[in-house]
Amino acid sequence: LVTTFITDEELWACTQCNACVQECPVNINPASLILDMRRYQVMEESKAPTGLNTVFQNIENNGAPWQFSQDDRMLWAEDLNVPLMSDGKNPDYLFWIGSAGAFDDRYKKVTREFIKILNHVGIDYAVLGTEESDSGDVARRSGNEMLFQMQAMMNVEILNGYDVKNIITCDPHDFNTIKNEYPDFGGNYNVYHHSQFLQELIDNGKINLDGKEFADKKITFHDPCYLGRGNGEYDAPRSVLDAMPVKNVEMKRNKSFSLCCGAGGGQMFKEAEKGDKEVFMERTEEAISTGCDIIATACPFCMVMMTDGLKYKNKDEEIKNYDIAELVSASLNI
């Protein structure tokens, strides 16, 4: 099919956002078909965009899409005194950091702020530390099914070895993978995206957000594809924002009709195909048009793309991009 009916450019431009699946009037799953074709190219023809081949090698060698050492996976936690599963405790929750949360400079700040919230509330948690490895999401969406399954089986073995029951993560991609795909490999857990966990803390009265720092600010929330369309969670992040004295404004395309940031499906790690406009620029312009002061995100990939978009539009001084964990932490003054 590829090159005959579908070009390589079309095949690899897909962000796996699943908007086509939602809109298809005859219930065809185009995203799944695209993924099958990517698998054929990668597994049978050893063919993939250059950037993705590098990602595959990095995950296989280092347990992350970037060329960082596995031993550096806890550098983000310097001076935070974060408990480890290997300490021998059996906590209520495992906080799954994810590769972006451990290595991406911008999202490491989000990881630290969420840890501060957990400590502030007194949540019984621990992390895997250097035992954690990439979830395999990027490998699977990019067609490298063998690498994904290797990562999944390895992670499930470690998680089950610690008898983990409840997992929290800030990454919607890892949230989706661990919740919906790890059960196929014997990994059955209660998995929470951090927006859901924060909403639960607010609903139970464990945190109260005065949000004075953001009083009367206009905030627009960008729905991550794998939190929203992928798992039907639209209310939790908005409920968290509603707990602050801010004015929430919606983008034209929101919730189930939200536009992808453009980073999913491996796009984060490769050059974009030629076109009139990159997806992240379209989404950034849509956010800017709301007149917002802050773009709230809840995904490391979305964070990168929206931040880059604001810089390209020379709006990064006027409009800020924060993860909801950062907004909550600032509201708690911790």
Give residue ranges: language-model regions.
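Short, conserved active-site entrance elements at the starts or edges of catalytic domains
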Residues: Y189-F197
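Ferredoxin-like iron-sulfur electron-transfer modules
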Residues: L1-Q16, A215, H222, G275, ...
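Cofactor-cradling patches in redox/metallo enzymes
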Residues: G101-N190, Y226-I334
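Phosphate-coordination loops involved in phosphoryl transfer and adenosine-cofactor binding
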Residues: N90, A215-K217, C292
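Iron-sulfur-cluster electron-transfer modules
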Residues: L1-Y182, G186, L201
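Short, surface-exposed amphipathic charged segments that create phosphate/polyanion-binding patches used
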Residues: L201-K217, G262-M268, S331-I334
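C-terminal amphipathic alpha-helical segment
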Residues: D203-L241
